[in-house]
Amino acid sequence: MEANGIVLSPDPRLRQECAVIEEITPAIEALAEKMKKMMFDNGGCGLAAPQIGELIQLVTIDCDYTDKNDYDPYVLINPVIVEQSDHLVPFSEGCLSIPGISCESERPDHVVVEAYDLDANLIRYEASGDLFCVCLQHEIDHLHGNTMFERLKPMQRIKAVKEYQDALARGARPGETE
């Protein structure tokens, strides 16, 4: 199931391990541009390739923009969390693939991520206790077949899935969190 070009849960593509990108081709560059546009058009701060049906390790993130003139998302190819704190803190997160709800989950409050950019440069991203920190982890989870539901405790998950089903029945679209 899709809305606005975004794959919606429980589509099985969101549960797949994504392939490593071996070469940065013009097709990968074009896909990254498409993802940036889709992320912006749907009001997201992050988008992973499986969320548009592409099962490869490609992510776009921009937690800082205020309008399209300031819009310059990061493109992360084959991102890997190389360090993370043991200290977990609660974060409220939403997902373009799970519209209409937000969930409070616990995540490490500090991560270091390594990924390649579109010029094949290895870039190191470090984030602590902010939206960027959550977004990095959330989008990397997508590349390994996990959604925000997997971060929830069992009873929280049951409640969140019910809220999501109700939101879909009301016609929730990507970018809506309540």
Task: For the regions a language model picked out, list residue spans one by one.
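Positively charged
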Residues: 1-178
